[in-house]
Each structure stands twice: as C-alpha cells, then as structure tokens.
Amino acid sequence: MRSIIIASIVALAIAFSPAFERTFEPKIDYHYKFDGLVLSGLPTASSELSQSRFSARVRIQAVDDRHIHLQLVNIHMAASHLPESEQIPSLNSMEQRELSEEYKQMLKLPLRAQLRNGLIAELQFDKEDAEWSKNMKRAVVNMISFNPIAPRNEIEKIESSYDKEEQSEENTSFFTNEKTLEGDCQVAYTVIREQKKTIITKSINFDKCTERSEIAYGLRYSSECPECEKDTVLIRPQTVYTYILENEELKESEVRSLYTVNVNGQEVMKTETRSKLVLEENHSIKSHIEKVNGEKESIIYSSRWEQLVEDFFKNGDKAEFAPFEKFPLDKKMHLIKTITEQIQEVENNIPETSHFLARLVRIFRTTSTSQLKEIHETLYVKADKKIQSLMEHALAIAGTKNTIQHILVHIENEDIVPLEAAQLLKSIQETPFPSQTIAEALIKFAESRVSKNNQVVRQSAWLAAGSVVRGIVDYKNIRPLVREDKRELKEKFLRVFMQQYKDAETTYEKILALKSIGNAGLDISVNQLNEIIVDKRQLLPVRKEAIDALRLLKDTMPRKIQKVLLPIYKNRQYEPEIRMLALWRMMHTRPEESLLVQVVSQMEKETNQQVAALTHQMIRHFAKSTNPCYQRVAIVCSKVLSFTRYQPQEQMIASSYAQLPLFLQNSFSGAQFDFAAIFEKNSFLLKDLHASLDAVFGGNWNKYFAQIGFSQQHMDKYVQMALEKLESIEKESTTVVRGRRIQTGITLLKELALKMNIRARPANYNEKDAFAMVYLRYKDMDYAILPVDTQLIEKLIEKYISNGKVQFSEIRRLLNQEHEFETHHAAYFYEAIRKFPTTLGLPLIVSGKIPTVFSAEGQFSLGLEETELRLTVEARPSVAATHVYEMRMFTPLFEQGVKSVQSVRAYTPIKIQAVVGMKRNFEIVYKVVVPENQKSIISLTTRPVVFLRFPGFSKFEYIEAEERTVVVPQWQQKTQEIEKVFNFLGLEVSTRGNILNQHTLENWLLAEQDFEVSVENKYRPAEFTARLTVGQLEKTELSQIKYNKIFEKEFELEQENTESRREYFTKMVKSIQKEQGYKSVVSLRLEAPRDYTMNTEVTTVCDKQVRMCQWEVEIRRSPILEETKEWTLRSQLLVVRPEMPSSLRQLHDQPHREVQLSLTSTWGSQKKSEVTVNAQLQQSKEQKKYERNMDRHFNGMPEYELLIKAARLNQINAVAEYKLTRETEQVLARYFDLVKAYNYWTVSSRPENNENDRVVVQLTVEPMSRQYVNITMQSPIERVELKNVQVPRVYLPSIAQRSVKHLLNEASGSVCKVQKNQIRTFDDVLYNTPLTTCYSLIAKDCSEEPTFAVLSKKTEKNSEEMIIKVIRGEQEIVAQLQNEEIRVKVDGKKILSEDYSAHQIERLGESDIVIELPEGEVRFDGYTIKTQLPSYSRKNQLCGLCGNNDDESTNEFYTSDNTETKDIEEFHRSYLLKNEECEAEEERLSEKKNYRKYDERKYESEEYSFEETYDYEQENTNKKQKNQRSQKKSDLVEKTQIKEFSHRICFSVEPVAECRRRGYEAVEQQQRKVRFTCLPRHSSEARRLVKEARQGTVQLDDHKISFVHSVQVPVACVAY
C-alpha cells in the first residue's frame, strides 16, 4: 500500500511544477527597475573611485510556465569620479553620458529564455544582436535564475516529505552545482522563510568550477610554486546573490561582486559590480515583446568575441572573421602619424614615449596584411630612423600573425639589417599569441636563404620558433579549465626539430637544434633527449645540452625527469660533467625525500671528488634556502644532510654551487642568485659556469628570469696549441739546437717506453672537436648563443698571424676606426593579460606590461699610434620605461578601470676618453666629460590612477581617457619630501620631489611619488680625469731604510735572551741593507672641475728576496666642505721578516723568528691626526711549546712537514700611540662599543688607569683548530678581553713556507706517494707492492709526445732507502741518500747543492730535494717519493704505479700495454724495468702476501711510524703526509680527556688521541699511561676548564698531578 502511495505522489510531482517556477504568471507583463554600478579604485576608505551607472527598465513576459521574453527599455548611463558609498548613487548625482542610437537599439533587442527548475536553461537572442549586448542581457537574466530546493533523488524527497509534512516551511542551507553568468561552479544556498517573505542568498565557490569563460595570455614564463599558491592568489573574485520573494513572487534581486588584485596577501586594486532588480509593477500584457529565433545559447558569459579576436591575432587574414574590419585604414594611419609626430616633437625619450609605443602596439594588432603593406609604403618608408626602428619593434611586440609575417617578409627582402632583425626575432619569442601558423612561418623563415647566409638571424629564428611552440603546447593554457589534446602538434614540431638535429654537421648546429627543443618544452621529447644523453658516441657538449633541454619539464613531469636523470647521476661510467649537470637539473624538480636519500647515499660512496663536492654543496645550499618555492625541499635536504657522515675535502679548485637568496620576510617576493661552477681533471679551464637570477613577486615565480652561462670542451687544449703558435721565433741557430735537444729528450723517453712495452695513450679528443660557448637565457628561454670553435680561432690566427709574425698592419686597421652611431630599441619586458566575466556581463581585464624605449646616438673612435691606444666615446643615451598594472572593464559603451603607473626616465649625455700608453712608464688615462649647457636627468614617477572613457571604442577617433590620480593619505605618510640644490665640483645638482621611505611592492603600487635628480653644467665642459701611472722597477740602495728597534714585550714576561735576539736582528737587517734593492712607484691622480685634485703615490722598496720592504703612501686632496687647507695623508709601513729556517734544529736555535712591522701615519686638514703602530707577528706560548716538543732528529719529508707547522706564527702584538682629533676618536669609540655589544657574551672588561693616548692589542689564534681567537685590548681607561671567538678557519703564515706558487700547487694538485712498499696513487688508492732493486716506473707521461718519467728502485735488498731517476725532457736526473745527504747526478755528472737551481732542483731542509717537472714536481728524501702534478694534468695519459690521475678510484690498475687488470702483481710487473744492472728478486715478486689493496674507507696508519715522537706529532705528521685531496674519511683528534667523579672533575694533563665522535670507530688500540689533575666540581675554574676542554685541548702543565691512569688510545680509526 505504501509503494502505491509513493508512486502516486511521484506522478503528481512530475505533473506539476514547483511553486517558485510560477514566479512569472503567463500573460502578465512584469516591469522591473534595473540598476547596475561599476566601481574601480583602491581598496581604501574615502578614496575616489571611477563609477559608472547603467539604468534601464526591464520588461518580462511569461509565454508559458517555462519560457519568458525579456526586453530592456529606457536605457540611461552616467559616470563620475566619486567616493564610495554603500548605496547606488542616483543618476542625478553623476555626470550623464549619452549613448549612441546604434548602441541603444542593440540593447533594446529582446531575448527568449527557458526556465527549468527555476534556473535559466537556454537563451535565444536576436540574430542582429552583438556579443557585448548579449552578455549585458545575460547579466539581467542571471538575476532571476535561482533554485532554492536542495538536489536529491526523488525517493529521498518523497520519504522526507512523508515524514515531515512541513519541511518546505523550514530554513535550509545546502551546496549544489549551478550555471551562472560567471561559469558552472559550486554554489552555496541559504533559504530563510518568514511568514509571507522568503529571503534566498546564493554565493559562488570559484575554486570549484568546471567551466569558466576565462582567458589568459603571457603566463607561460612563470614556474609552479606550490608553497605560494594558497597565500598569493593574484585575483580573488567574490559574488553574493540576494533574492526576496513575497507570496512566491520575485520582488527584489541584488548581486554584489568584488574582484581584487592582491600582492603579498594585501589588496592593492579592486573592481566592484552592484546590480539591483526591483519589481515596480505588473499588469496584463498590452504589447507583446517580439519573438526571437536565434541560436540557443547558455547563460554562461559568451567569450565568442574574445575567441574571434584571438583567432585573428593567431592566424591573421586566414581567420574566419575579421573583428576589426570596421576600423577604417585611413583612421589607423592618421593615429599612427599623430603618434609618430608627437614622438618626434620631443628630442629625448620621456615617459609619454613608452605610452605612445603601447598605443602603436594596440593599433598594429588590429591591422591586416594589406593594411600593414599600405602603412609601410605610406608612413614607414618616409619616416626617419628613430620612427622606423620604433615601428619595427612595435610590430614585433604586437606578436600577431600579420605583424610577424610582415617583419619576416622585409627581413627576407633584406630591408632590415641582420643585427636589427635578430633583435626583432627576440621580441617575437615573447609573443602573447603563439600559434601553429606563427611557428610554421618562423620555421620556414629559418630555412630560408637569408637565414642560411647569416648565422645570427638563423639562430634567432630557430630559438624564436622553439619559444612559440612552447606557447602553443604549454600546459598553462589560454583557457585554464579547457584541456586540449595537442599530441599531434607536439609530434609534428618535434619531428621538425629532430630533423634539424640530424641534419646538423657541426657541434654548434646540433646545440642550436637542442636549444630549440629546450625552448619548446615538449614533454614527448624526453625519450629522444635521453637517447642523446646516454649515447657516448655523441660529443660531450651535445649531451650536456640535451640535459639542459629538459629544464622546462620540471613542473609538468618531474618524476619522469627524475627517472631519466637519477640513473645518469649514479652511473660512474658517465663523465663527471654529465653526472653533475644531471644532478643540477634534477634538484630543480623539487625531489621527494626518498630520491634525496639515494643522492646522499651516492655522495657518501662517491669516488669522484668533484661530483661528491658539488653534491654536498648543492644539498647544503638547498637546505639553507629561504626561497618560498623551495621550503619543502629545504626541509627535506636539512633532514637527509643531518644523517650523512660525509665531510667534504678542502680543495682550492673544486666544483661548487652557491645560492644567495634575498627574500622579504613574511612575503612571497624577492630574488635568488644561483652560481654553479664545474671543474674536471682534464682541463685547467672551467668546464661549465652558470650564473642565474630567479625572481618571485607576489608568489609569481620566474625561474631563470635571467641566466648567463659558459661551457667548453677541449678548448683549453686548443687554446694552448694556438698560443704556442704565437710564441716569438728565436734565432735560427738557437731554434735548431733547442729543437735537437728536445727531440733527444723525447727519443730517450720513447726508448724507455719501448723497453717496458708501454703503449702510448693517445689523446681522447680531436682538436677539431674543441668547442666553447657563452649563452644568455631570459625567462627560461635561450635568447642568444655565442659559439667559439676551432674554425673561428683559426680564422683569427690566419688573419692576424702570418709566418709566425704578428700582422700589425691588420691590427692597426682593426683598431683605427671612427664611427657615428644611432640606435633605437623598444621592448615589452613582460606582458600578461587575464580576462574573466563579471556579474554585469562586462569583461574584466587584469593586465601588466612594461613598455620601454631606449635610444643612443653619438660618435665612437678608436686609434692606435705607436705605443698608445686611444678610445673616445661621445654618447647621448636616453631611456624611458613605464610599468602599467591595470584592472579595467571594456565594452563599446564605456571603458573604466584603475591602474598603477610607475615611470622611469633617464637622459645622461656623456663623453668618455681612455688612453693606454707604454712609453717610459705604463699609463692609463680615463676621462669623463660632462658637456656644457646640457642637463642630465633621472626621474621617477609612481601614481595610482582611476579612469573613465566614453565611449569605450570609436571607429573614427582616439578617445582620451578621463584620469584622476588617487591620493591616499596613509600611503603619502610613507613618503618624504626632498628639495635640495647644491653645487658639486662646478655642476649644479638638483634633487626635488617626494620618495618612499618604506620600500615594499605594495607601497610602490599605491603611493604617489614624483622624484627627479638633475645635473646641469652651465659653464665650460666639466672634465673628470683619472690618471694611473705604473713606474718601471728601478735599482736602489736599501741603506735608506732605518729599522733598528725590535718590538718589546707587552703582555707577558718570558725568560729569553733579549740581547742576543736584538743583536741577531740588527745583524740581519744590516746584512740585507748591503744588498741591492728595488723600487717601484705607482701613482693615481684624480682631477675634477674647480681645480679639485687628488694625488696618491705609493712607493715600494724591497730587497730581491722580499725579506725587508718599505711602503710609503702619500695622498693629497683639495679641501672640501668646511675644510680650508689641503687634506694630506702620509704613511710609512716597514715590514721585516726573519730568515727562513731549513730544519727543526735551525728553527729552535734561531734567536729571532718574528715578523716586525712598523707603521707611522699622519692625516688631516687644519687638524692633524697621528698614529704610530709597532707590531710583531710571533708565536704564542702554546705554539712555542709545540715547537719545543717537536725538537727531535727527523730527516727528509717528515722534518719539513713538521717544520712548516712548528714555524707558524699565530699571535699579533701591537702597540699604537696616537694623537687623534676629537671627531675621529669618537667615531672609533662608537665602532669599538659596537664590537663589544655584538660579542656581549664572550667579552669581559675591567677599568684600568693606563698611559694616555696609547693602546695595546694582542690577538691570538688557537694554533690547532685555527677556528678560535682571543683578543686582549688595553686602552687608557680599561682592559677588554674577548675569549674563544669562533671564526672561519684561519690561514696561519709559516716562516718556513716555500713560495705562494708551491703552496697553491700543494693545495690544488694531485699527489702520489711511494714509501717502503706502499703506494698511494693520484686518485687516492692505497696498495702494497714489493719494490726491488730493479727500477719500477712510478709515473710517466704516456702521451704520444712524452715529457717526463719518474722511476725508482731500492738501493739494496731489504733496505728502505731508494734511488730515484727522473727523465725530464733532455735530462736524466738520478738522486739517492748518501751519508745523510742527498747526492744528485744530472746526465751522469755529480752536481753540488749550490748548482741545483740551474737544473731546476730545490733543496728543502737538510735531506729533501724538489725536482721540477714540465708540469708539477717530484720530492725525494731518500725514503719517500712524492710526485705532485696539477689536478688537470694529463688525464688518462699518465701511466705507472701511481695510476692515471682521472679522479676515479675504480680503474687504477692499467698495465703498460693499456689493459685494465685486477691483479696488482701483473700490474706491477708490467712497469718493472729488468736489466743486467739489477736482480729481479723473483721470490718477493711472486709472494702474494706482498700485494694488498686497502679498502677506500680505511685509513692505513703505517706511514711515518716514528716511535720516538709524541703521539700528537705523529698524528699531525701522518695527516700532513696524506694526500690533501683525499676525503679524510677517518681521522684521529687530540682532546683533553675528562673523568668525572661525585665531588671532583679530573683532566688529562696532556692531550689524548681519540676517534672523531661521529661516524668513526677505533680498529686498533694501545695502552698508554696518562697523568690527570683534579679540581673541586663546584669551583669556577673547573667549570671553565670543562667548557674549554669540550672545544679543544687545555694547557695544564702548571697544575699538580693527582694520579696516573692507564687508558686505551686508538692508533687508527675507520669509518663505519
């Protein structure tokens, strides 16, 4: 029975419509009053807004229950600039605006609507109705479309009504999807029912729409920033409907919509629409509304007009409809002529010039091909150069199919010069209307004759084609909610680009093809690019470019990019550059934690140090990034980095990555500078260098907003070869002799290779493959490439070098030039447009652009006369740029909106002269001339503006907008007024206006500023001259240097023989003064108008060995400001360094080992300040104690290594006596107070009464870690101490250190060490092999033209002493230890130590020599051989027991015939030179236990095991003997050991070795007795010592011994 009842009710529900559908009764004429208001302005109270009001009477006639007819009558418009009010202002309070009869008739055309469940289902318009008119009528119909019943299935409805009879009378709230004028979106209903009155409220959720008539252009350059999207929504629409029904009849309907533009979360612009529909009367129909029979359409805003315009822009005359054909050509030409005449009226560019450019762009976008041809023939041809250039650039900026085709035609006809054509193609790259036809036109042009004949044009065309294709296929679609299938288009263009790649014959052409693919950002290109990357037959620059071509896919398919690049990064078979670039690209895909864990794992076990170093730096910098778009990645990187035990090695030349993020706190704006440099062992030049700028403004992320990069392959080898060709040709006889000697040396090395069956390692590169390029990237698009290949270099050499002689005539012809130039350039730095509908049926357009015009004209001359090169440039540059950010409504009826305008103008006429001459002295003269009677101007203007334009569009004339600047008091308070005029060196400088004092992006958009700086020269030309003169090195006497006083102790009284030290010092100085000295003078003179001068002269006097130097500085300057006398500075600095000790014993016995410094300085004008500083660079007590403990009998390398450490100077003592002016003293006091405040927690001070005008300073660097500094300063009134201030690791000078050149070699080179039977290779592989009395080849240049070889053998069986033989070119050097002294033979003849330098041999200490190689050096002390080569030396062309120096530790064992083996015995035997002079010791060679390769994670402690030394000395010695480029994966550290008890704390008196706390464990330990001293736990000294002991070692020699305890001390550690 129940089911029958339910079925009956369902039938009734279907038969009858709900009550609200009968709002309009049939045959009744309803008259509603419609009022619409548009407000545009700033979101601030009491500011003026542009307001336009639309009023009409709406007639609605219900044809039947489901159809109505609607017509607008009595239409009126009014508009004014008024403050905002809550109610719609009356028509009388606003200025009346007349509508043309054509527009009125259009608006009066009727429409027919079908209602379904209260909603407008379909619309029919008159066939003559225009799109803009239809949309305005949609806005009216939209106000009567509502359905207050919640959607649910029929059974639920009936059961609900069956249970609750009065359900319809209750208040309800629900969500549903509904079509409105603004789209198909989720809406929220609230229904409140009162007695006879029902109030219905409806709001729209724009985040949940399936369809919206939204269009966007120019957004393809931004990258995704997920972290920014939630808080930085640029445009936020809000719409609320309110319906009031009485007795089921619609009495009133109101719609309010608010659209705001937000920057950094703050509203900066708004547009508001208000619509109200009020029932005035209803009566029976007296006159019927005409029936319409147009096509059925939806209520959603129609963007057909926008689509027609877009189709015209993209396809030109081939479009189906010409939307601008009603705009007559003669009126366009008249407007263009008017604009060009206005531009010509002003000599220089002004902000209006950029506005004129924007107007030209708008006009050109409406033109057809025939119209452009007419404009060209009528206006362009007759215009001057500036107007022609502006018109060309305006056509390129317009970026429509017609304008682009017009430009390409004229480039093909060679009407535009190639350089200008390339600039225009760069502008075309940024067209906001990319299309298939434009891309095809560019590709066709790139294959044309003109392009093939000019590489600059061809390059620009292909890059532009790629960028346009990106715009076509980019996922950031023109219509965001519409997804089109573009696979066919992608495949088509990919085939074109890949065919270009396949047809390429040179490296440059292949790279150009790949850059075109990269600019296109085709996701389907990943597989082809991957094939190129992994194909080792391809040249390395091509494979690297293939990786770079994946950059635009980081947002669309990050996982796919990671899937391609992660295996490449982890595969050690690939080249290091490829792996590092793969990692770099992969990191920009913002990888997840699971992937980063794999990267860190690979880093920890990485054998290539360049790859490991770059990986660590990259992850570390990403972890510290403050870029809001990388916050998730930063957190993950921090996490994975905290768990790694990898410690990067210290290298001077290593691949590196750095970031400099500059972001505003709590805002999503800022910039980030990225820097990446990739080095490789086979090149002394950088392999890759990238510097980029990322910009984030209000959450809009422009990745690679600008980038410049350099990449090269084998170019260093080719450059080296080319430079050799440029060397001067020596005399014929010398050349012949030298050539014979070199050939003899090469023959000697080749004979050695023949004896040992060494196969030459040919270079793995072809000179013709050498390639380098510099590229420029803008907005993530490759913009320009400058290739450098062998052909270019050879052409230059052929042109300027002939028969080995420089062709000076060609060089003079190149350098003697004189030109006049005039250039003009125009561009949009960006243009972005977004359009979406409003509830008034009007399109709202939010756009931004920066039209910029730059001009420069002048003369340029370059001349070479004898030894003088002269450059003169006279230029008059001017630039004008305007940033326009606007929000506007546009219809033919009117145009209204709000915009923020920022304009910059600069005009700076200038003349520059530069002269470089080399006569008696080297001289550079640089002169800047400000012309007379000319004014340089730099101005800045910002203002928010509201505007109105009636009508909005005219076919016959340009309608000027009614603008009004909005002044907001709260923003004007953030500016300051400036008005100042002063005279500077004869120039009148004027600054006037107001400028912001709080700089944020929103302040720049909303505040009114008008600031100008002008510089005027009213008299003769003002010349500013800088003259730098570098004098020749002259001989001089050193007796003029007086230095007899040594530094006296100030802080400590130490028992030492002061008299003997003074005598030693005086004797040393007198000895130096007897030698020949050298003097050089460098002067700099600055001259300015009004007889202003400044002279600086620096005189340097030094002895030949630079042991004693004196610098004198004298500066004279004309008086300025309130000075009445000449300002002068006279300073003299004298430095004397001690003699360089050659052994530890000599260091210990040397009375004077300090560096003496003396500075006297006087400066000032009327009042003089004087300072005298005596300083001494010396050793602290701790360092001296360390040196005394080292005083043992060492020889050879161990002695020298310890000597370097023992001779370090780690303390500076200085005494300054001064007489300062009060102002100077106050400034210095403020700075000192600032230092004390900054180090508040580490500084202590106490008052003292010391000598006046005297300061004593002591600075001590902790000598072990070199990361902590103690500073003590004693002033006349106090004593200040700063303890344990942490600083970056400090380099401590050593008086025993060799030259800077050798220091750099040690820090940056590759080292191989041979000791006993143990070898550590160049690539840090440690293994044992038995050395015999037969020569073994340690290292050799195994190229086809070898330069050196190093061999070694034992002097006797079971002896640790060795003999070394070095074959270096034409020389054979043999050395061995005899009677505790190294004996050397060169070509079989003994040489004395004083003759070493003539043979490029140096003696270190008493038994250590250094033999220089063509690249690098060999050190030998009789027991150990240390071969050191530059890190880039002979990669894969070295052979011998030291390996191949290729930075890979997995492929060390290549035999002499270049075959890889795992058998160390086989490897060793291949490099064994057997002859009758030696016994092969076959038993030792065959014993397998004599061969062993150590695990790379272990640290072998067998090196330099001297039992008689202290543990600390041994540990430091061992670490120094380690190859400095190894990772030091295991290490021992010295610390003071602490033992804690209940009431006391005990400290070890001497440091105790232990493993590093994290990641290491002891593998071998020994017992050691250690002395301890104890202190009460509660004592302050105990707490202080605990703190110091945790940071390093503590000196406790003067404390009482409490007990001796046996502890376990590690001998070696291993990373676990």
From Swiss-Prot:
Expressed in the intestine of adult hermaphrodites. GO terms for cellular component: extracellular region. Keywords: Disulfide bond, Glycoprotein, Secreted, Signal, Storage protein. It is found in: Secreted. Residues 1505-1531 are annotated as: Disordered. SMART domains: DUF1943 (SM01169), LPD_N (SM00638), VWD (SM00216). Glycans are attached at N1270. It comes from Caenorhabditis elegans. Residues 24-689 form the Vitellogenin domain. Residues 1310-1479 form the VWFD domain. The gene is vit-1. It comes from the Eukaryota. Residues 1505-1514 have a biased composition (Acidic residues). This is Vitellogenin-1. Precursor of the egg-yolk proteins that are sources of nutrients during embryonic development. Together with other vitellogenins, may play a role in modulating life-span, acting via induction of autophagy and lysosomal lipolysis. Disruption phenotype: Simultaneous RNAi-mediated knockdown of vitellogenins vit-1, vit-2, vit-3, vit-4 and vit-5 increases life span, causes accumulation of neutral lipid and an increase in lgg-1 foci in the proximal intestine; however, does not affect fertility or pharyngeal pumping rates. Expression of transcription factors pha-4 and daf-16 are increased. Disulfide bonds join C1312-C1442, C1334-C1478. Residues 1-19 form the signal peptide. GO terms for molecular function: lipid transporter activity; nutrient reservoir activity. InterPro entries: Lipid_transp_b-sht_shell, Lipovitellin_superhlx_dom, Vitellinogen_b-sht_N, Vitellinogen_open_b-sht, Vitellogenin/Apolipophorin, Vitellogenin_N, VWF_type-D.
